[in-house]
Amino acid sequence: MPEFFTADRYNEQGELIAKGGFDLARFERALKARNINELTSGYQIDFIGKDYAKKQAGEKSATVIVPDVEHNTLAENKNSHNLFLTGDNLDVLRHLQNNYADTVDMIYIDPPYNTGSDGFVYPDHFEYSDRALQDMFGLNDTELARLKSIQGKSTHSAWLSFMYPRLFLARKLLKDTGFIFISIDDNEHANLKLMMDEIFGEGGFVTNVMWKRKKEISNDSDNVSIQGEYILVYAKTGQGTLRLEPLSKEYIQKSYKEPTEQFPEGKWRPVPLTVSKGLSGGGYTYKITTPNGTVHERLWAYPEASYQKLVADNLVYFGKDNGGIPQRVMYAHHSKGQPTTNYWDNVASNKEGKKEILDLFGDNVFDTPKPTALLKKIIKLAIDKDGVVLDFFAGSGTTAHAVMALNEEDGGQRTFILCTLDQTLSHNTIAKKAGYNTIDEISRERITRVAAKIRAKNPATNGDLGFKHYRFATPTQQTLDDLDSFDIATGHFINTSGQLAAFTESGFTDMINPFSARGLGVPGGASGEATILTTWLVADGYKMDIEVQPIDFSGYRAMYVDNTRLYLIDERWGTEQTRDLLNHIGTHQLPVQTIVIYGYSFDLESIRELEIGLKQLDQKVNLVKRY
């Protein structure tokens, strides 16, 4: 870069007036001209839509959470801690920031690879008007058109804009000791690596695993037969450690000796008991006399008492002549294991994944399922037996299958959170012909069938083989318009003419039923109250398996949570209910710190009466009004 260095400058008298050197200002101007922001942001990946993708990561979801009451109340599901969430994973991740931040042990995702044949196009809609987008990001008309060009496209920028906010939000859900594993192929691998370096930090990179997904060499390429794909692994912080794997059969065969009369417990190998003088921490110097009388004085790794314990336990090898330098005997079955490698050539292939689907369904209802052996390996590396696994590209449900199978094998209590879109299946697919309408139906059915298979094999099992199901739905525009017409000051719905408005939401006469499963156009039988309560509980930081206790106040059903919080959503609250509630609190029958009310269900007089009554109590109770 010689063009950025200047020479010393002298005046006409030969006096030095400016020392030469590196011209930082000129260098910065050159960087700016080339749109390189190295000095302030460091090395980073840029793509069309990046600023908008960052904006999306900070937005709140406009969806509500609808419990599948018919499913969740079944005996096998009502006490389950597993979750299946149907909806756009961006919306789901936004909601989960409230109640699952810093709680997930491991994330695995198998996102679309953007190969051109996997059907990926940028699906997210722009949530702002053109003018708002221009004002937000300082775009001119040409730049705005460039931004919106990614919609419905499968370009690299479209894929990165799709993935960025999801990965950004996913990181926040991980514990500080957590890991994320992402399956990907050559097409977006380089871009994904750069994006993950930016979101998780380069220091968060753990490894890039090459998984041999296909054992056969195919003739579908003129150059190279693709047999593997990548699994990128990142840690949220440096606090987590991947677990050791059991010693492989190949390693034991190569490195361990067969059992002998002297060491009959199993395959074993001798390891040195000596240490080098240069090792920090030193060692222990003493004399050891071998069985044949040979004396060795060296720097030993163990204190003399510990050495004598090894001898007593028959864990010291003195060589074939019983006079060699003593070595410790390590049995293979006593080993804590070995680190995994970044090349997995002995894990099940995609062919096994397809066979598992065929065995469960009797047909190939899913095109590209990952094998459960791959997920089991990842899960065992990343979490303990009681960890939480999140997969927000759930696909065929392999992750749930792996969690349930592992728990059955080792008695673990791992739980899963799965999310997938209710994407409609094409009419010519095998799954559609088999009676499935959406991808999420296949995933849930797989979990159900795996559970049945485990129960059939082990009727006495007490593992968690169920799951709670929730749908993430957008209220109708008419419902939103009705909500906007509510005047908090008067407690009435006002139309555009300033007159009292009749509800225009067809079939409903209140602002609860539009949020029922029927009102939102989804199955499951949820009441509007159940949807509102579930959405609020998540927003207030409660897990989705939190126990909710109905409390009766003079014929009015309230919902009590966490021994501190009361939710009043239904209509028909009046003086009698207020009196009953105040009596429960005042006589210490019911500890309450906060009462949350659905403002649309309460008239102003009832709210004022409740506010006055709460202020007269000896204890402070917060009243939160939501509209």
Task: Give names to the regions the model predicted.
Residues 386-395:
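Conserved class I S-adenosyl-L-methionine
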Residues 1-63, 72-76, 81-82, 90, ...:
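Accessory, often C-terminal, charged low-complexity segments
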Residues 125-134:
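Charged, low-hydrophobicity low-complexity segments
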Residues 109-111, 392:
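Conserved beta-strand/loop positions that form the S-adenosyl-L-methionine
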Residues 360-373:
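Conserved SAM-binding loop and adjacent beta-strand
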Residues 87:
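Cofactor-binding loops of NAD(P)H-dependent oxidoreductases
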Residues 396, 401, 416:
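Phosphate-binding glycine-rich loops of NTP-binding sites
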Residues 400-410:
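Conserved SAM-binding loop of SAM-dependent methyltransferases across substrates and taxa
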